Amino acid sequence: VTNYFDVGTAQDWFEYNDKPVFFCDIDGTLIKSQTRVGSNTYYDPPIVLENNVKIMLEYQSKGAQIIFTTSRPKSVDHITRSMLESLGFKNIQLISGLLNSKRILINDFNAGNPFPRAEAINLFRDDDLLKNFL
């Protein structure tokens, strides 16, 4: 047998496979939705969706990679990064300035592992029940 990656025991495999890559929206997902103008802007202290943040921090502490995505303009990246750090997130990767429209994840899978490796979760805005989907 050649060209394989030995992850050890079945338990080792489950731990290795339990390190997903998340593309996670911020507003309405980790904090109550903030906007450029109005009563709850990017400049105001966030109203944290505690349960959602907790589960994402748990995944990150186990080695999951989180790439934060947002329609917030790049001009407020420093505010966004600071807010994410204050929530406890580390190694922040941020994609900002996205269109406020449908987001589509495209990924491949192969015959050696015929199970689809891409998933999508749609939460109601400001819903704090992410753990029910993970």
Regions from the language model: what does each represent?
Residues V1-K19:
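Conserved alpha/beta core of the MobA/IspD/sugar-nucleotide pyrophosphorylase nucleotidyltransferase superfamily
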Residues K19-L134:
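HAD-like aspartate-dependent phosphatase fold
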